[in-house]
From Swiss-Prot:
ATP binds at S33, G34, G35, L36, D37, S38. This is tRNA(Ile)-lysidine synthase. GO terms for molecular function: ATP binding; tRNA(Ile)-lysidine synthase activity. Belongs to the tRNA(Ile)-lysidine synthase family. It comes from Pseudomonas syringae pv. tomato (strain ATCC BAA-871 / DC3000). Its main location: cytoplasm. It catalyses: cytidine(34) in tRNA(Ile2) + L-lysine + ATP = lysidine(34) in tRNA(Ile2) + AMP + diphosphate + H(+). It is an enzyme of class 6 (ligase). Its EC number is 6.3.4.19.
Length: 445
């Protein structure tokens, strides 16, 4: 949204311009706290809806239950929406205790928003230019990288829909001016005055001091955040190219585990390696700061016959056969519980390890699915008895995958190893053992 004069007279036109990409959405949800920012946003939208063909408006108030005074806010918000003719919903959430009450409340709030967004819906929130400047300062003091210093994007994916912040180019002074001219009422959150919260200190003490010396400080800081956002976009585009150049095809692609060729990545500069790895791993795990990437270098530079891994918050990165593999935390745990297969005509659900089935005529006898314990031996037609470890080596099954690989037994006889050619069924091909591995959205303890 372009900036303008501080009186805010042109806010409706500027807002309509900022929302142009979202005019075809089915519903515009408005995050409505009852404070100044969201009150002005909702009023502007309701007024615009009288003369423009806009998506349906639906206000959502999230009650965090953190202070007694907030109990009156849902009713205030309901009355405001009733007067504006806007659909209203109040949602009470539970804020999980943690080191940061602000962060926990934000997570609970956005979880509630995400739950309500349908495909193509848009959530509109009222963050403004001063909020953007505050966010940049806060993250700068925490040592954030380019992505963090880009502060709040104007739009991003949120659940099945999108989040848009159409007021990021508007100052708080403009919002206050508009609210007074329109005679709007809003609630004041007393926690915003609590100096124990770092952002409140920046808002009430640091930014006013900066603007007293540099009147355009907030506009300059917000503009810098925009420049950094553009720089991050370029870094993302470069990383996407590097990921594409490192795509790997393995015999085990059906497992659905993220895999890249190490060679093309290792040939990049150190900074570019970290950029592509951040891009690839960001949807999969929380990442360390820039001072804690020694694990990546150790994995990258380990000897060819080593089994290096880089353990991260939500899983681990492994290396095998010239590739790097991402394993979620659940995959790190070997399975040990044997499962009896009473009716091999039906698929068998394995505890936290997907499902196996038999294609063709099932072998006779008492069947069960087990996992590697060591020293297993398998009889192969024309080859005699062979150590399972050697057979898995021949099939190039990475060692870190073997602990979850289903083995079919009849009594104590190893009959088959799921999905591995030559090991997955009977010599006469009357049956095959098939395994559908657990996917990322299945529960893995």
């Amino acid at each position: 949204m372009t900036t303008s004069t501080p009186n805010g007279h042109d806010l409706p036109a500027r807002l309509l311009q900022a929302l142009a990409p979202w005019r075809t959405a089915s519903t515009w949800y408005v995050g409505f706290s009852g404070g100044l920012d969201s009150t002005v946003l909702l009023h502007l939208l309701a007024e615009l809806a009288k003369r423009a063909n806009l998506p349906a408006l639906h206000a959502i108030h999230v009650h965090h239950g953190l202070q007694a005074i907030a109990d009156a806010w849902p009713e205030h918000c309901r009355q405001v929406c009733q007067a504006l003719g806007v659909a209203f919903e109040s949602v009470r959430v539970k804020v999980e205790p943690g080191a940061s009450v602000e962060q926990a409340a934000r997570q609970a709030r956005y979880a509630a928003f995400t739950e309500r967004l349908g495909e193509g819906d848009v959530l509109l929130t009222g963050q403004h230019r001063d909020d953007q400047a505050e966010t940049l300062l806060f993250r700068l003091l925490r040592g954030a990288g380019v992505r963090g210093l880009a502060a709040m994007p104007e739009q991003r994916r949120l659940g099945r829909g999108h989040l848009a912040r159409p007021l990021l180019g508007v100052s708080r002074v403009e919002l206050e001016s508009y609210a007074r001219r329109q005679g709007l009422r809003w609630v004041e959150d007393p926690s915003n005055d609590d100096q124990q919260f770092s952002r409140n200190f920046l808002r009430s003490q640091v930014l006013p001091l900066l603007t007293s010396i540099w009147p355009h400080a907030t506009a300059s800081l917000a503009r810098t955040a925009g420049h950094l956002g553009e720089a991050q976009q370029l870094l993302d585009e470069l990383a996407a190219q590097d990921v594409a150049n490192a795509q790997a095809t393995t015999p085990f692609s059906w497992l659905g585990l993220p895999v890249l060729n190490l060679g093309p990545i290792a040939r990049l500069s150190g900074a570019r390696q970290r950029n592509v790895m951040r891009h690839w791993l960001a949807p999969l795990t929380r990442l360390p700061d820039s001072d804690h990437w020694a694990g990546w270098e150790a994995l990258r530079d380990a000897a060819q016959d080593a089994r290096p891994l880089w353990r991260l918050a939500d899983g681990a990165l492994h290396r095998a056969q010239g590739c790097i593999w991402w394993l979620p935390a659940g995959w790190e745990q070997a399975c040990s519980e044997a499962v009896n297969w009473a009716d091999p005509r039906a698929p068998l659900d394995l505890p936290e390890n997907g499902q196996v089935s038999l294609e063709g005529e099932a072998p006779l006898g008492d069947l069960s699915v087990r996992y590697r314990q060591g020293a297993e031996v398998m009889h192969l037609s024309g080859r005699g008895r062979r150590d399972l470890k050697r057979l898995l080596n021949e099939q190039a099954v990475p060692a870190f995958l073997r602990g979850r690989w289903p083995l079919l037994y009849r009594d104590d006889e190893l009959l088959a190893v799921a999905n591995l050619p030559g090991l997955d069924g009977s010599p006469n091909e009357r049956w095959r053992l098939r395994w559908v591995a657990p996917t990322g959205d299945q529960s893995l303890s």
